[in-house]
Structures are given as C-alpha cells and as structure tokens.
C-alpha cells in the first residue's frame, strides 16, 4: 500500500510506502543511522549510557520482527526515486490506566536523512503514521526523545506535540 506521494519544493517526488517484516534488514539499517544520531546527541546527557550499535541493532531487529509480525504496529519508508530517505516505526497501546487518552499510538523510531531534513519528508512520514493510527482507533500519539535533542523537539512541536511527562533516570552503583 502506498500513501500518496507529493512533489515538494526542491525535492523530487517523495513516496511513502508501508514496510513489513520482509524489509527488516532495511529497517534495521535505518535504525543504525538513528542510533548514530541518538548516540551523538545522548553523549551530552550525563548518566545516559548508550548500547553499542551492534548490540542495539540485534535487539531492535528482534523487536521490529515481533512487532511487524502482529497487528498492533506499523512501519513506513519515505522513498525518493527508489532511494530510502526516511522511516517511521510505531505501535499501539490500549488506553492508559490513569489518563483519559483513548487508544494510544506510539512513535518508536523516526529518522530522515540529514540532507533531506526541512523539506517535508518528515511531515509526510508523520502524516502516514497519523493516518495509520487513526485507522487503528488511536486518539492520541506519544513519543519519547533525548531531552537535549532541540532539532527533534522543534519538529515535534511544529507537529503539535506538547510535553506531558518527564522521564528521569538515575544510575545505581553496584553492591
């Protein structure tokens, strides 16, 4: 299933296409790009240890395979002239046990190649994710990001996201 492509200013036609488990290697390849970016951003966050790219990729590959083999997740690629330029992976949760949110769609992984940022590729991927979530009955979209990732924060705020929770971490010393 292809989501309608659009001609964007200064960008050839971008097409958003569904990615299933049959494209797992490509999804993990994009995870590696996201991991490198997140690792560089996270380096400035005290106490946030990052798994190696290889260890993380094995875990994410298993997670994506499990998710995409079931009904409660999705993945999309953005393509420009047959070249992959971005991706989004998400999943669904039932309503929160305390907050009146309805079914929740989660953006787990989202990445656009740096040279295409600011040209509408991310917006097209998010529109595909929102449409998928609406179809699955989600009424809210949630995501997490590294606290000091100001570029991502600005993008998500332009997309209408607001900060509702703060996740905190503390390192435990060994006994």
Model-flagged regions — what are they?
Residues 78, 118-126:
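Glycine-rich acyl-CoA binding loop
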Residues 94-107, 117, 138, 164:
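A conserved beta-turn-beta hairpin within the catalytic core of GNAT-like acetyltransferases
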Residues 57-77, 106:
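A short helix-loop-beta-strand connector motif used in the catalytic cores of GNAT acetyltransferases and
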Residues 35-63:
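Conserved GNAT-fold acetyl-CoA-binding loop/helix
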Residues 77, 83-92, 106, 111:
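Conserved beta-strand in the GNAT
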Residues 113-115, 119, 147-148:
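Active-site acidic-Proline motif in GNAT/NAT acetyltransferases
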Residues 123, 127, 135, 139, ...:
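Conserved active-site alpha-helix within GNAT-family acetyltransferase domains
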Residues 1-29, 33, 40-46, 175:
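Conserved N-terminal entry element of GNAT/NAT acetyltransferase domains
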């Amino acid at each position: 299933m292809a989501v309608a492509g659009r001609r964007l200013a200064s960008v050839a036609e971008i097409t958003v296409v569904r990615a299933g488990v049959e494209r797992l290697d490509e999804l993990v390849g994009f995870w590696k790009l996201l991991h490198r970016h997140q690792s560089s951003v996270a380096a400035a966050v005290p106490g946030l240890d990052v798994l190696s790219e290889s260890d993380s990729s094995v875990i994410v590959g298993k997670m994506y395979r499990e998710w995409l083999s079931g009904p409660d997740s999705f993945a999309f690629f953005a393509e420009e002239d047959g070249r992959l330029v971005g991706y989004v992976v998400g999943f669904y949760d039932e309503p929160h046990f305390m907050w009146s949110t309805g079914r929740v769609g989660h953006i787990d992984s989202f990445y656009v190649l740096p040279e295409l940022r600011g040209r509408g590729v991310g917006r097209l991927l998010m529109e595909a994710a929102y449409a998928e979530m609406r179809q699955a009955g989600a009424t809210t979209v949630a995501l997490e990001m590294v606290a000091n990732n100001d570029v991502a924060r600005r993008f998500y705020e332009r997309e209408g996201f607001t900060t509702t929770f703060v996740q905190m971490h503390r390192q435990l010393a060994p006994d």
